Structure formats: C-alpha cells, structure tokens
C-alpha cells in the first residue's frame, strides 16, 4: 500500500510541471474549400471576389464619360439634329451607347464599316471638330435644299449637321472636283456619303444627270461609288437610302472627291487630338455624379479585390473577371477550438492535429505557441518567430495569385453587322470558352493555395513540437496530446528556456533520471505485489472449491444417494 501511495504522489508531482504546444483558435465561422475538403472552418479567411457595384455610370479617374443618351455613335458623328447636345464634346473616359438608341441614322440607310469605326473609337479619348469644306463654298450646287422630313428639327425638315446633301442648281449639276489637304499634326476622321434614289424620276429631279458616280481617293484609298436606283419600302417616310463611309486621313495626306451627282459631301471632320484607353459600353444606366477607378456596364466597382463576377467588359483599373460565385482564401489555421470534441479531418502533416485535439482561444498574440503549468502558475505564450514567418508567408498570397494569373483575358465588346453574324456567334463562343477556362484555372489555383496554406500551418505546429521534443529528450514524457510532462522541476526560467530554444539538457538530466528510475521502480515492485496476491487468490479459491466438492460427496454417500466402491 505504501508503494501505491508513493506512485500516486510521484505522478502528481511530475504532472505539476508540464508544457504543451498548441495553436490559435477563435469564434470564427468562416469557411474555405480546398482540393481535398469542402467547407473547412478557419480562423481567418479573405474573400477575393467582388460581387457588388453601385449601379451608376461614373467619372473614370476624374474624367467624365460621353453618355450619348438616346443617340447612337452614328447619330453623334454625322450630326443627327436630335443629337445637337453632342455637337462639341470635351474629353471623355469612355462612351456609353444604349442598346437601341432612338436617334440613329434618321434618313434610312447604313454606315459602312461601322463596327470597325467603333473599334477605332475604343482607342480615342477626344475629338476636335473642324470645318474642312464650308457649306457656303458650294456656289454651283444647292447646299440648302438637301433636307428631309425623316430628320426633323423644331418641326421642320432638316439633315445631318456634319455633312451636306448637294442638289442640282438651275437644272444643272456640274462635276465636283474638291480636295482637302490635312495640314494638322493629328489624324483626321472624314465622313461622306451617297444617296440611292427610289427611281429614275427622283434621280433626275435631284441631280439632273441620269448616270452619276462618286470617286474618293487618298494615298491609301481608291473608291468609286455609283447609286443603286431601286424601289424599296418606306422607312421613316423615305423610299431612298443613304450609305455613309469614313476614312482616317493622315497628316500631310490629301483626300480628293469627284462626283456628278448623289454626293453627300463632308463639311466637318474630326481631328483625333487624344488617343488612349477607352471603350463603347452598351448600358441603359444614367450618370451618377460619382468617380471610380473601374467601370462596367452594370455599374462602377470600387474594390481592392483581385477578382469580380459583375461583367466581362470593364474599363479602368479593374479586378479580373471570372464566372465564379465564390472565391475565398484561407489566411489562418483550421479553427478547432479545444471545447469541440468532435474529431476533425487532418491536414497533410497531421499536426493540427493528429496529436493536438484542439486550439487555444486563450492565446491571442500569435498563431502557434505554448501553454505551461508549474508551481509558479500557468499561462499561454505565442512563439513569435514561427508566427512571424507564417504571417510573412501568407501576407502576399493575393499578390501571388495575381502574378500567377497575370495574363488577363480581355472580353472586347465587338459588334458585327448582319453579314457577319456567324462570325459573331463564333467569337462569342470563343470568348465564353476562354472565360470558362480562365474561371476554372482561378478556382483551381485558390483550392490549391488553400490546401497549401492549411498544410503550411500544420507543418509549422509539428515543427514547433519537434523543436521542444528534441530539446527535452528523455527529461520529459510525451503524453500524446501535444504535451510533455517533466521528470524534473521546471520553474518559469526553465520553461522560458524551452520556449526560446536554450534549454540546458545536462543541467536537469540527473534529476530527471532519478525521478524516472524511482517511478519505474515503484511500478515494478507494485507489479510483483499484484502477482503474489493473484497467485494466492487462485490457490485459495481452488482449495475452497475442492473442500466443497469433497463434503458434498460424503453427504451423498451417507444417505445412499451416491454409491462409493473401492476396488483393490
């Protein structure tokens, strides 16, 4: 009995000095996905997908957009009378056009290479409108009667402001030969057109000459147009049609016009005074009197996140577009508070845990650390070195992902005419395919980074445990739950030496050896006592059973219930 009491006293003495390795835990409910698991609760996580916008059109870095309201790009450039507010526009950051603007080509027809012109505008930030052929210079032609009820202004017939519809004068239409030399230092956007009458009567009524042509030439352009006279259904009250053309006239280049009828001459041209990143957005939004660094057709984005899922077409300093609904990066550890007894799935290294069943909510100044207990008390202490290394390792995680995904696929809002719908459909499928691949790669990268982060934390905890184990060696006992019981007295100074890696093993080895041997001896003597008692108990039980059997036999023989025969 004395031996058993000594054993209990010794065990309680050793348990009083103990050090444990653990990790931070908190009340977080944030969850992330990894390659191996879904919905892993972590102490800290960072959402890297922007889902919100303000629903407004804003200035981009202080520069207002050109919002065309009910006017199309064609209506603005040609000068639809209903678009007079855009006769002179200041510098713009981007252009906004509605999906189906009411004020387009008021006189029915089409704009040649319109989509290519829009693409050109996506690299321009400012036009300066200049007069190249004054309307008053057409002395041999009627430059005032070329108006139409299809282009009304203040209740009267009118026409596009930037071009002149030339009509015969005094029953004659002399052949036109005009040139304009671009003496500016900037490129010049020049517009002109041709009228296609409804019938021969309209042709001679307007131009006198039954057979006409228009020739246009520059150093890079050689064009000859003839009117196509045909009966057509009326559009905007007109059976005739107009076709408009454009070219970019380089500095010191000249454009030459020659025509004997059906000519819609340029009066104004656009000097391209500033080039830069721009775009034409299809949007029904109104101006919001706000400023942003990133604009989409759905609204402005003000975010520092690296990804967004709002719209593939953006302008400015924008996050990268993905089709994902959720992208969350793990920046902390698996969150398994100590009070939670349900076993969690283990990481690759099995540290958080495998042998450590829960985190410490009491340790708030670091990710990994120690809990000690001795005669002087107990407490938590973070391991600042390993924590700082871990913080350094995850601080730049978002930038690392951006660098790995540094090839942004740009969804360009291309437009195609009716003859190119098949190309448009193919282009859309290609863009959708690129975005699908881009999104998949992003999601996969996040899953891999999350797996790597959690395994990184697991590894750090295991490394800290091994650091203590290698110092203590046989001076302490591993308890299997992340804790060590000392075989010697370990005051606060001793505990601190374990934490900072300066533990003096030889200093405590003799005391530890004696206590370890004493505990082992008590266990062995106790085991011998238990063996003697066990043998005695077995013999006594067998003897008692034999006496009972013999007594029962004698009693049965005496009353005749049992016959006993002894043969010699």
From Swiss-Prot:
Residues 17-531 are extracellular. Keywords: Clathrin- and caveolin-independent endocytosis of virus by host, Clathrin-mediated endocytosis of virus by host, Disulfide bond, Fusion of virus membrane with host endosomal membrane, Fusion of virus membrane with host membrane, Glycoprotein, Hemagglutinin, Host cell membrane, Host membrane, Host-virus interaction, Lipoprotein, Membrane, Palmitate, Signal, Transmembrane, Transmembrane helix, Viral attachment to host cell, Viral envelope protein, Viral penetration into host cytoplasm, Virion, Virus endocytosis by host, Virus entry into host cell. Gene3D superfamilies: 3.90.20.10, 3.90.209.20, Hemagglutinin Chain A, Domain 2 (2.10.77.10). Disulfide bonds join 20-483, 58-290, 71-83, 106-151, 294-318, 490-494. The chain crosses the membrane at residues 532-552. GO terms for biological process: clathrin-dependent endocytosis of virus by host cell; fusion of virus membrane with host endosome membrane; fusion of virus membrane with host plasma membrane; viral budding from plasma membrane; virion attachment to host cell. Palmitoylated. Glycans are attached at residues 26-27, 39, 170, 181, 302, 500. Homotrimer of disulfide-linked HA1-HA2. This is Hemagglutinin. It comes from Influenza A virus (strain A/Chicken/Hong Kong/220/1997 H5N1 genotype Gs/Gd).
């Amino acid at each position: 009995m004395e031996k058993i009491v000594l054993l209990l006293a010794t065990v309680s003495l050793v348990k009083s000095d103990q050090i444990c390795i653990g990790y931070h835990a908190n009340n977080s409910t944030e969850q992330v996905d990894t390659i191996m698991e879904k919905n892993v609760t972590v102490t800290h996580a960072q959402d890297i997908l922007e889902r919100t916008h303000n629903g407004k059109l804003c200035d981009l870095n202080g520069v207002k957009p050109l919002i065309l309201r009910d006017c199309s790009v064609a209506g603005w450039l040609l000068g639809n009378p209903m678009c007079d507010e855009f006769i002179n526009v200041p510098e713009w950051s981007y252009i906004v056009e509605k999906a189906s603007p009411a004020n387009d080509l008021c006189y029915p027809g089409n704009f040649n290479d319109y989509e290519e012109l829009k693409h050109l505008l996506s690299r321009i930030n400012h036009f300066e409108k200049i007069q190249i052929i004054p309307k008053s210079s057409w002395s041999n032609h009627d430059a005032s009667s070329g108006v139409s009820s299809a282009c009304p202004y203040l209740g009267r017939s009118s026409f596009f402001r930037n071009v002149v519809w030339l009509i015969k004068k005094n029953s004659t239409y002399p052949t036109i030969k005009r040139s304009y030399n671009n003496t500016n230092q900037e490129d010049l956007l020049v517009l002109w057109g041709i009228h296609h009458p409804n019938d021969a009567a309209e042709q001679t009524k307007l131009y006198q000459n039954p057979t006409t042509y228009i020739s246009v030439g520059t150093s890079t352009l050689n064009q000859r147009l003839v009117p196509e006279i045909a009966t057509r259904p009326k559009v905007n009250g007109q059976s005739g049609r107009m076709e408009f053309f454009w070219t970019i006239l380089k500095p010191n280049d000249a454009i030459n016009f020659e025509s004997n009828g059906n000519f819609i001459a340029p009066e104004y041209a656009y000097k391209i005074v500033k080039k830069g990143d721009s775009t034409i957005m299809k949007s029904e939004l109104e101006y919001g009197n706000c400023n942003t660094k990133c604009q989409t057709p759905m609204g402005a984005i003000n975010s520092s996140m690296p990804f967004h899922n709002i719209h593939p077409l953006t302008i400015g300093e924008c996050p990268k577009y993905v089709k994902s609904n959720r992208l969350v990066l793990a920046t902390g550890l698996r969150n398994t508070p100590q009070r939670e007894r349900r076993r969690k799935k283990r990481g690759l290294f099995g540290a958080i845990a495998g042998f450590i069943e829960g985190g410490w909510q009491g340790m708030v100044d670091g990710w990994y650390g120690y809990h000690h207990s001795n005669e002087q008390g107990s407490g938590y202490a973070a391991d600042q070195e390993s924590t700082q290394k871990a913080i350094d390792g995850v601080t730049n995680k978002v930038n690392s992902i951006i660098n790995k995904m540094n090839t942004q696929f740009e969804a360009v809002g291309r437009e195609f005419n009716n003859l190119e719908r098949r190309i448009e459909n193919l282009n859309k499928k290609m863009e959708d395919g690129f975005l699908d691949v881009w999104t998949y790669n992003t999601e996969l990268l996040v899953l891999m980074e999350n797996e790597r982060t959690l395994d990184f934390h697991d590894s750090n905890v295991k490394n800290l445990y091994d650091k203590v184990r290698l110092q203590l060696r046989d001076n302490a006992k591993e308890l299997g739950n992340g804790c060590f019981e000392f075989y010697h007295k370990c005051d606060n100074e001793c505990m601190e030496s374990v934490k900072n890696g300066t533990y003096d093993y030889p200093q405590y080895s003799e005391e530890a050896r004696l206590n370890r041997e004493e505990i082992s001896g008590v266990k062995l003597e106790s085991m011998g006592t238990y063996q003697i008692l066990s043998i005695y108990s077995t013999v006594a039980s067998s003897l008692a059973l034999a006496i009972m059997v013999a007594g029962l036999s004698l009693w049965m023989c005496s009353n005749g219930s049992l016959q006993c025969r002894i043969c010699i």
